[in-house]
């Protein structure tokens, strides 16, 4: 009976120790976190294309407003309304991009706990660099977002004043 209880205790301890070996490694968890961040940004490429198209359209409208405003004020009013709608659309796309990048940033922040658990220093340094790059990118986007948003507000004011 004593022999059986010792065997049971050793088996239980072995199972407990081995359970830690079979759980997900920090490297795997980190990979998943970075993958999730990348998935959050998936729509940003298409949003950037849409924003670019809207910018071109806005520039064309502005040029038409300037040209036609010299000749006919009535046709310009329609163009001014279109231009104001264009700025609103750009604001929506820009906000959507910001939300996607913020979600990605949250995923990157969640990766921090896995980076700390990595034992391989070379891999840890690489993970820190990736994390740092994401953070710098997020900061740069926020600065661009603030400037672009300010520009859109001024553009709207201009179109309102011209009406």
Where is each model-derived feature located?
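Extended amphipathic alpha-helical interaction segments
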Residues: 76, 90-163
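Bacterial N-terminal signal peptides that target proteins for export
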Residues: 1-8
């Amino acid at each position: 009976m004593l022999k059986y209880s010792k065997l049971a205790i050793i088996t239980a301890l072995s199972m407990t120790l081995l359970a830690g070996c079979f759980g997900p490694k920090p490297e795997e968890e980190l990979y998943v976190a970075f993958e999730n961040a990348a998935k959050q940004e998936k729509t940003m490429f298409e949003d950037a294309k849409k924003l670019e198209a809207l910018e071109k359209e806005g520039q064309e409208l502005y040029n038409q407003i300037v040209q036609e405003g010299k000749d006919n004020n009535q046709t310009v009013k329609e163009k001014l309304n279109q231009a104001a709608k264009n700025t609103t659309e750009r604001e929506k796309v820009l906000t959507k991009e910001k939300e996607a990048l913020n979600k990605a940033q949250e995923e990157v922040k969640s990766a921090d706990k896995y980076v700390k658990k990595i034992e391989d220093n070379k891999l840890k340094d690489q993970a820190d660099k990736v994390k740092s790059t994401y953070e710098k990118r997020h900061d740069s986007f926020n600065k661009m977002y603030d400037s672009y948003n300010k520009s859109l507000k001024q553009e709207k004011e201009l179109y309102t004043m011209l009406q």
